């Protein structure tokens, strides 16, 4: 017999490391231990943390396999009693579970014939934490599985995981010799709490916007076969009474029900609705050849007469941060379709396939990312900025209207007009929804009273970066590049030269002629003799706000754009 009390054991796995691992606070009693004979083991480890924490292994094993100790036959029981995960991690000297904690209790029966190892039992985790985040509910696992070690084949007869009171059942096989592993498994889940699943996902690093809470239930009946990273799926997945709410959401966002039908070649949803307040967005999604290197998506989203606060709420509920600096009122009409091949199912790839239209009619919009009045004053060289041109990074837009056409992920406007406190701004140009690039031209017409306040024809940029029309209104053409969240402004000397050459100087009362001039510079059509006008001065940020609305609807969108040539 061999007895060890409060001892230390050093083990070296030469296939994994050249440094031995030291284990301490160990009690071991071996009976009938001799070469080529079975033996009895009674071993326990006492954790050094708070409370009574013990791991006990009892059973019969041997003879020891001299070639590979892991293939030694063994029949026994492993017990965990109030074992702290963090203390267990320290004992194992392993960083793999850093940030994870909880209290483990359970019992597992182990049977190994030297080739196949079967484990049957249950483990419970109380006060579970993942990445330092308290889950707020217990986690338990019941399992019955066999590992054919030499052949790398795992058979899962039953694996039931409970997040709180909700069970998720899995069974099937896994071939682990290939990379990635090959799986053939069935998964069933009935009335899984979305709130509990979201907490677990958030703790694992997959989260919605901070401060957002979700509720609802999910049912799944799925058969997955193939490579573990891209298995072919069959079955159904459905969710009901989904709702997202939170302190940062203007109003709750709801999906009453959504059903996904899964086949090995296609995933298709039923037509479903997303609602927030009085706004309803109608959507449908189909994904084909999803196991191939290049899948095909076909998705639609239509939201007639949608309220801007509702669209902002929907965007924030789904983790879109590009709209965090935007608030306001008004409506927009959205008719979009994403259709085409994508290399991956990322937002940037899907955005490249977007086509459709957006019509906006906003009011009282605030954008906290920049001050367009300040940017325009720098370009024009205002002598006396005046009280209306705050140095704060806020753009106030009392009115914004226009149409946006999207083709293959490029959003283009020819008539976007915005009313600012200093005058009107008209914008034309494009925004790349995938690369976040802005390629815009803007013309600001400063109201006469404001024009006089800032210096009139005595401004530093007069006849260089700004003109005056016959009504005494300053006109400032500008190029906007950069991104939605960080636009860059510079003088548009080409547009200025065109205005001087053709005598087309916009005014406040004729915004249509303004877009004609801009359209001509960008290769579009213009009406001879028209004078371009802008709606009350705006900052590039208004355009930014519209593009970001698109971003909210179809994923995070920002854009960097090369300056127009």
Regions of interest found by a model, annotated:
Residues 16-28, 48-62, 90-109, 133-144, ...:
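Amphipathic hydrophobic-ligand
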Residues 128-132, 242-247, 447-456:
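Short aromatic-acidic-glycine turn motif
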Residues 43, 78, 121, 170, ...:
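Membrane-embedded beta-strand positions of outer-membrane beta-barrel proteins
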């Amino acid at each position: 017999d061999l007895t060890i009390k409060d001892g230390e054991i050093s083990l070296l796995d030469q296939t994994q490391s050249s440094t031995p691992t030291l284990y301490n606070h160990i009690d071991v009693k071996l009976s009938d231990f001799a070469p080529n004979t079975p033996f009895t083991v009674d071993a326990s480890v006492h954790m050094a943390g708070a409370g009574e924490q013990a791991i006990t292994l009892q059973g019969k094993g041997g003879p020891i396999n001299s070639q590979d100790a892991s293939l030694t036959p063994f029949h026994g029981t492993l017990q965990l009693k109030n074992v702290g995960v963090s203390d267990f991690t320290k004992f194992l000297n392993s960083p793999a579970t850093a940030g994870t904690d909880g209290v483990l209790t359970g019992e597992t029966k182990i049977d190994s014939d030297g080739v196949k190892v079967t484990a049957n039992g249950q483990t419970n985790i109380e006060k579970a934490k993942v990445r330092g985040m308290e889950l707020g509910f217990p986690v338990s696992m019941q399992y019955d599985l066999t590992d054919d070690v030499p052949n790398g084949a795992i058979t899962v007869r039953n694996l039931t995981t409970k997040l709180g009171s909700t069970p998720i059942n899995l069974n099937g096989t896994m071939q682990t010799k290939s990379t990635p592993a090959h799986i053939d498994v069935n998964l069933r889940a009935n009335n899984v709490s979305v709130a509990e699943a979201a907490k677990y996902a958030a703790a694992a690093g997959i989260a919605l916007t901070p401060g957002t809470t979700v509720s609802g239930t999910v049912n799944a009946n799925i058969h997955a076969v193939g490579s573990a990273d891209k298995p072919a799926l069959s079955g159904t997945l459905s969710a009901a009474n989904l709702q997202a709410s939170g302190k940062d959401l203007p109003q709750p966002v709801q999906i009453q029900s959504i059903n996904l039908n899964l086949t090995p070649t296609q995933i298709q949803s039923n037509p479903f609705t997303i609602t927030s307040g009085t706004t309803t967005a109608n959507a449908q999604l189909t994904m084909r050849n999803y196991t191939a290197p290049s899948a095909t998506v076909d998705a639609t989203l239509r939201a007639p007469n949608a309220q801007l606060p509702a669209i902002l709420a929907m965007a924030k509920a789904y983790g879109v941060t590009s709209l965090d600096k935007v608030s306001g009122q008004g409506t927009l009409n959205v008719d979009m379709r994403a259709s085409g091949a994508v290399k991956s199912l990322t937002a940037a790839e899907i955005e490249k396939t977007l086509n459709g239209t957006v019509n906006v009619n906003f009011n009282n919009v605030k954008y906290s990312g920049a001050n367009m009045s300040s940017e325009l004053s720098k370009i024009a060289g205002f002598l006396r900025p005046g009280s209306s041109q705050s140095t704060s990074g806020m753009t106030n837009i009392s009115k914004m209207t226009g149409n946006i056409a999207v083709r293959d992920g490029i959003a283009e406007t020819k008539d976007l007009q915005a009313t600012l406190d200093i005058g009107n701004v008209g914008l034309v140009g494009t925004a790349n929804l995938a690369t976040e690039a802005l390629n815009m031209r803007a013309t600001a017409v400063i109201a006469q009273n404001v024009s006089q306040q800032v210096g009139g024809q005595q401004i530093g940029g007069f006849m260089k970066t700004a003109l005056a029309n016959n009504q005494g209104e300053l006109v400032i053409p500008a190029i906007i590049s950069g991104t939605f969240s960080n636009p860059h402004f510079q003088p548009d000397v080409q547009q200025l030269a065109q205005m001087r050459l053709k005598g087309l100087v916009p005014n406040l009362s004729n915004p249509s002629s303004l877009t004609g001039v801009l359209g001509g510079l960008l290769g579009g059509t213009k009406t001879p003799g028209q004078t371009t006008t802008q709606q009350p001065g705006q900052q590039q940020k208004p355009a930014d706000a519209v593009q970001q609305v698109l971003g909210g609807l179809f994923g995070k969108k920002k854009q960097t754009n090369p300056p127009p040539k």
